[in-house]
Amino acid sequence: LALCGGEMRVYPAKTVILCCGGAGNVYAATSNTRDVTGDGYAMAARCGLPLRGMEFVQFYPYRIYSPKRADIFPDLFDHGAVLRNEKGERFMDCAKYPMKELENRDVVARAEFAEKEVRLDLSGCDKAYLERECPNIARMARDNPDKPLLIRPVAHFFMGGVPLRTDCSTDVAGLYACGEVTGGLHGAN
């Protein structure tokens, strides 16, 4: 598929490797670039291949979406940042989540989905660390003192896809696959 013009072009080949991203853009909120739209899955399906495990999608829980978009890195929580719900409560508490905000991504994402609103609280962060290691987030907080930094999970990685053999071949002769377009390699998470 030609990106300019959108017409289909045929290039005969003895071997083809599907190596493309997942389909993050089927979700309104994703960490994927705009071109990750499931094209590899569609090509595989057009060749008659089954897709498996497509219901398993990993969500990245650390995305600021308002007042601007930005990813935060988990080590920020080692330096005093916490997640709070719309009532101001820290919902990733020790009783239920021993590792708090540093639980596995799927655990944090599910906890966030259960809340009405999730806010990033930076009040406990060392300011020098924040300015040095996360200058864009520090600037966002400084430039918007009356607006909370709102967090939500975003679609990140499809665990399912094209079934493979150990040599990356598929059930279609000459068609191989690797990368996120493949399925059954990563389990449900």
What are these language model-derived features?
Residues 26-43, 47, 172, 184-189:
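A conserved FAD-binding loop/helix module that cradles the flavin
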Residues 1-10, 16:
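Conserved beta-strand-loop-beta-strand element in the redox core of flavoprotein oxidoreductases
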Residues 43, 49-148, 152:
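An anion/pyrophosphate-binding glycine-rich loop and adjacent beta-alpha core
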Residues 4, 8, 27-35, 71-74, ...:
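Alpha-helix capping and helix-loop boundary segments enriched in small/acidic/polar residues
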Residues 11-21, 44, 176:
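Short hydrophobic core segments
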Residues 3, 135-182:
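A glycine-rich dinucleotide-binding beta-alpha-beta segment and adjacent secondary-structure elements
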